[in-house]
From Swiss-Prot:
Family: Belongs to the 5'-3' exonuclease family. XRN2/RAT1 subfamily.
Highest taxon of source: Eukaryota
Name of this protein: 5'-3' exoribonuclease 3
Biased composition (Basic residues): 1000-1020
PROSITE patterns given in the database record: ZF_CCHC (PS50158)
Pfam families cross-referenced by the UniProt entry: XRN_M (PF17846), XRN_N (PF03159), zf-CCHC (PF00098)
Gene name for this UniProt entry: XRN3
Main location class: nucleus
Native organism: Arabidopsis thaliana
Length: 1020
């Protein structure tokens, strides 16, 4: 799933989802920086219990930080990470738990994608190095000095993979960081910290989800636990939905489209508005003010994405016209998660039919709502897709393929022609601009009353006729009384400044060249499109070109196998999101996906999985690394990747085909690498594994999560008693011994504790980094944490949950867009009412609202932000803060008129209505209400009104107060009619909306089956 594209689609379609983070900054007093006191209330009026960090979303940015120079050592990366975590902690301020999860060994299904990424990364790095060397030679010929290359420990980002030396040292550095904060930061004193490092199998975000799922519905669990998850992957949103935890937020950096980020319109720089612009030129990397520290970079802002608001949007957006039975929102949420897998995920190749940028999710949602009545039930039941219904759904989507491919081909042709015209125009302009010119001095001009004058910078040395004489010119400008030593220092400083400028110019040119080369439209030898989607015969040509089939019989055989494996993948992914890994060995064995219309006869498939075991870290490195990254492996393992006589040398091609597959940029292409043969790989490893040192064996082993708490924590007594009990046990006996956690001592956390292999409470904790202090009076203890015993994940909110007050109503929904393949950009006529759009929305003048336009409250909010940014965020001429409360609306909001059901399933504003409904004065639109003295949320009941064409909704639309017969749904997709039997609990439970709504439901037993070897077997 595209990282920015899905998040951007969601934030634009549902704007109330996101809220900007209010960030409190450290203050500096007499040169001493005073950190933020995180024990104080959160300025965002949101108090969170647990903060979860998907650490790979922190490690990768710290290899290439935007707020400081690029690091060259591991220690610089670690320091950047510490600052990064500190900043996130200040934003969220968890009160019970901080969970840091680093990616461990991934399931085999993910390793194919990891292999492709790492091979591409190595190839791109090689190409960039060659291009940089060419540019350096060009600069030297022109006499332009460059600083020498600096040796770097972090030259290869592929080392961010389990089993490498970097990941081993990182674990130690994070343990030190946790000890440092628990010992000295008052905001950390009462929290538990769990560190799941790279030696614990599983992707970071899925280790977090396993923790959340297995805490639910156990004794002592608080159903109103408030979760916040940080990470950069778009699938975190789906994972948050899949927990069915209501009080859940995703924290991430703001995603900008090019040109979208707010800049000062005077100087064009980010980080401030015109009202407080100082007219300073943009700083280059490495430059700083005389008294500055050189770290004056713009920090990216952050946003919360609230899952409970997304649930409210989905309840309204996914309403079914004239439903055949009462709709269960929890089942709708699960179906939404499932249908979004078709637009992309990390485990299956991209289906050629659907593109997010072409409105694919809108199409999937429209088809789902239109076809729902004919499904006779939901597409999924927990982690189990009903394949018969899935086939019916995806066939309806596939019926649009011809139109989609035809429009895509037409737009691709237009885009290619436009790029060629632009390219020709730029070439002409370059020829006109070849004559050398000298830029005149800029004249100081007053911007506005009370502002500073814009300084007129002197021309750079290379704005003169001969850049190489610049240093001598600067010597001649020295005053007669200046000393020779001062002149030498001045020249040296000038040379260093020139080198920095040249280095920045080289980096800029390098980025431009790499981007130009990655653009297929800039290539003189454009790859021929042999498939020609949209032209008759596209299906046959697709299988001939992508799967190398020749005869019709072979094509049909391959098509059936591709469909089977792809359907297995859909079932595997759904289980992974809802319950966890159902097979460590399964993977999709093709580079390409089938068409939507190819997914037939799904109900006849008998799909099974065997759990198996994860790879060892070094085995995964052999499976995903190119030979260029072999330096990160032990010596004998390297030879398996580089020796021409290696039995698996064919796994490591130095050159490989990248199929552009109709895409524009090379990074969008498909790397056609050979798939790893697990049997051959393990046989080769068995010949070298005995050569590992003790340290290498440790890096190659499977370990457990570590729990850290202060000695003052209520759980500390249990940890000390555990350590005393196990002192006389052998290492093997210590690993096997465990004691159950008492939830009342751990803020409701369940699980088991095991003594760690080292000291539980070392009196001194040495710093693994130069320049950082040792902890001489350590007051932190450590032990191993084990998850609670596996139990079924019940996919609905737990008993006793209190739903936040509603923040979204029908007026907050944007009109449903025209389907991409049907939208010709023209305004359609509708009967005799003048211009009318496709969404059932029109205004009194009969004119269509332009696509993407806003109105009503959204327009008012946008105008208010514009005024605030321009006038209220700076200081006046006397340096007096101008922040004032925002004015109220300057008009009386129009009376709200309920929308009328439109014949095509949407809603339209009735005659006389003016935009969207205005919120009631008491209505909170920022998420949680402030907590009262009792520590609970206000208990104001909410009940939505039943409307024609929309199901009645109380307490979020959860139905559980009725009972229906439910025919057992089979895993192979032959389920019978389903009349909304909500999956729930054995016995009764309560859902509370504002504290006074009761819900009841019935549960079923476990569906797990086991083979004779003890491994769970999952069957669809």
């Amino acid at each position: 799933m595209g990282v920015p594209s899905f998040y951007r689609w969601l934030a634009e379609k549902y704007p109330l989802l996101v809220a900007d983070v209010i960030e409190e900054e450290p203050v500096e007093i007499e040169g001493i920086k005073i950190p933020v006191d995180t024990s104080k209330p959160n300025p965002n009026n949101l108090e969170y219990d647990n903060l979860y960090l998907d650490m790979n979303g922190i490690i990768h940015p710290c290899f290439h930080p935007e707020d400081r120079p690029s690091p060259t050592t591991f220690e610089e990366v670690f320091q950047c990470m510490f600052d990064y975590i500190d900043r996130l902690f200040v934003m969220v301020r968890p009160r019970k738990l901080l969970y840091m999860a680093i990616d461990g060994v991934a399931p085999r299904a993910k390793m194919n994608q990891q292999r492709s990424r790492r091979f591409r990364s190595a190839k791109d790095a090689s190409d960039a190095a060659a291009e940089e060397e060419r540019l350096r030679e060009e600069f030297e010929r022109e006499g332009r000095r460059l600083p020498p290359k600096v040796d770097s420990q972090v030259f290869d980002s592929n080392v961010i993979t389990p089993g490498t030396e970097f990941m081993g040292v990182l674990s130690i550095a994070l343990q030190y960081y946790v000890h440092l904060r628990l010992n000295h930061d008052v905001g950390w004193k009462n929290i538990k910290v769990i560190l799941s490092d790279a030696n614990v199998p599983g992707e970071g975000e899925h280790k977090i989800m396993s923790y959340i799922r297995l805490q639910r519905n156990l004794p002592g669990f608080d159903p109103n636990t408030r979760h916040c998850l940080y990470g950069l992957d778009a699938d975190l949103i789906m994972l948050g939905l899949a927990t069915h935890e209501v009080h859940f937020s995703i924290l991430r950096e703001v995603v900008y489209t090019p040109g979208q980020q707010e800049r000062c319109f005077l100087c064009g720089q980010m980080g401030h508005f015109a009202s407080n612009c100082e007219g300073k030129p943009k700083k280059r990397a490495g430059e700083s003010d005389e008294k500055g520290d050189g770290n004056d970079f713009v920090k990216k802002p952050y946003q919360f994405l609230h899952i409970w608001v997304l649930r409210e949007y989905l309840e309204l957006e996914m309403r079914i016209p004239n439903p055949p039975f009462e709709i269960d929102l929890e089942r709708i949420v699960d179906d939404f998660i499932f249908i979004c897998f078709f637009v992309g995920n990390d485990f299956l190749p991209h289906m050629p039919t659907l593109e997010i940028r072409e409105g694919a999710i809108n199409l999937l949602m429209a088809v789902y709502k239109k076809e729902f009545r004919s499904f006779d039930g939901y597409l999924t039941d927990g982690c189990k897709p009903n394949l018969k219904r899935v086939e019916q759904f995806i066939q309806a989507v596939g019926s649009f393929e011809d139109k989609i491919f035809q429009k895509r081909a037409m737009q691709h042709q237009r885009q290619a022609e436009r790029v060629k015209r632009d390219k020709a125009g730029k070439a002409t302009k370059r020829m006109d601009d070849e004559a050398p010119t000298v830029q005149p001095d800029l004249v100081p001009v007053a911007r506005f009353s009370g502002s500073r004058l814009a300084s007129a910078p002197t021309p750079s040395p290379f704005q003169s006729n001969d850049g190489r004489s610049a240093p001598h010119q600067k010597v001649r400008r020295l005053s007669p009384g200046s000393s020779v030593g001062a002149a030498i220092v001045d020249v040296e400083n000038s040379l260093e400044s020139d080198e920095r400028e040249n280095k920045e110019e080289l980096k800029t040119k390098l980025k431009e060249l790499i981007r130009e080369k990655s653009d297929a439209f800039n290539s003189d030898t454009t790859e021929e499109d042999k498939v020609k989607l949209g032209q008759p015969g596209w299906r046959e040509r697709y299988y001939e070109e992508k799967f190398s089939v020749v005869t019709p019989e072979e094509m049909e055989r391959v098509r059936k196998d591709v469909v089977l494996k792809y359907t297995e993948g859909l079932c595997w992914v759904m289980h992974y999101y809802m319950e966890g890994v159902c097979s460590w060995q399964w993977f999709y064995p093709y580079h390409y996906a089938p068409f939507a219309s190819d997914l037939k006869d799904l109900g006849e498939m008998d799909i099974k999985f065997e759990l198996g075991t994860p790879f060892k870290p070094f085995n995964q490195l052999l499976g995903v690394f190119p030979a260029a990254s072999s330096h990160a492996l032990p010596e004998r393992y390297r030879t398996l990747m580089t020796d021409p006589n290696s039995p698996i040398i064919d796994f490591y091609p130095t050159d490989f085909e990248v199929d552009m597959n109709g895409k524009r940029f090379s990074w969008q292409g498909i790397a056609k690498l050979p798939f790893i043969d697990e049997r051959r790989l393990l046989e080769a490893v068995s010949e070298v594994e005995f050569t590992l040192t003790d340290e290498e064996k440790r890096r190659n082993s499977r370990m457990c999560d570590m729990l850290f708490i202060a000695t003052s924590h209520r759980l500390a007594e249990l940890v000390f008693s555990l350590d005393n009990h196990c002192r006389q046990l052998s290492a093997r006996e210590r690993v096997d011994f465990k004691v159950k956690i008492k939830p009342k001592l751990s803020d409701g956390m369940n699980g088991y504790l095991t003594p760690c292999s080292g000291e539980t409470h070392p009196p001194v904790f040495r710093s693994p980094m130069e320049g950082m202090e040792d902890i001489l009076t350590n007051q932190v203890i450590c032990c191993i944490y084990r998850l609670p015993d596996a139990h079924e994940h019940i996919t609905r909110p737990p008993p006793g949950v209190i739903f936040p007050k509603k923040t979204v109503d029908i007026g907050d929904l944007k009109p449903p867009p025209a389907l991409w393949h049907e939208d010709n950009g023209r305004r359609p006529m509708h009967n005799n009412h003048g211009m009318h759009n496709n969404h059932g929305m029109h205004n009194n003048q009969g004119r269509q609202n332009p696509p993407g336009s806003v109105s009503g409250r959204h327009l008012g909010n946008a105008a208010h932000r514009l005024v605030s940014n321009s006038l209220q965020m700076g200081t006046d001429r006397y340096q007096t803060p101008t922040d004032v409360p925002a004015p109220g609306y300057g008009y009386n909001p129009p009376q709200y008129v309920p929308p009328i059901p439109y014949q095509h399933g949407g809603y339209m504003a009735p005659p006389g209505a003016q935009g969207y409904a205005q919120p009631a004065p008491y209505q909170n639109r920022g998420g949680y209400q402030p907590r009262g003295p009792s520590g609970r949320f206000p208990s104001e009941p909410y009940q939505s009104q039943s409307r024609e064409g929309q199901h009645a909704s109380r307490g979020g639309g959860y139905s559980g107060n009725h009972q229906n017969q439910h025919q057992q749904q089979q895993w192979h997709g032959q389920g019978g009619s389903e009349q909304n039997n909500p999956r729930g609990y054995n016995g009764q439970h309560h859902h509370q909306q504002g504290g006074d709504h009761d819900r009841r439901g019935r549960g079923r037993g476990s569906h797990h089956h086991h083979d004779q070897g003890g491994n769970p077997r999952h069957r669809y």
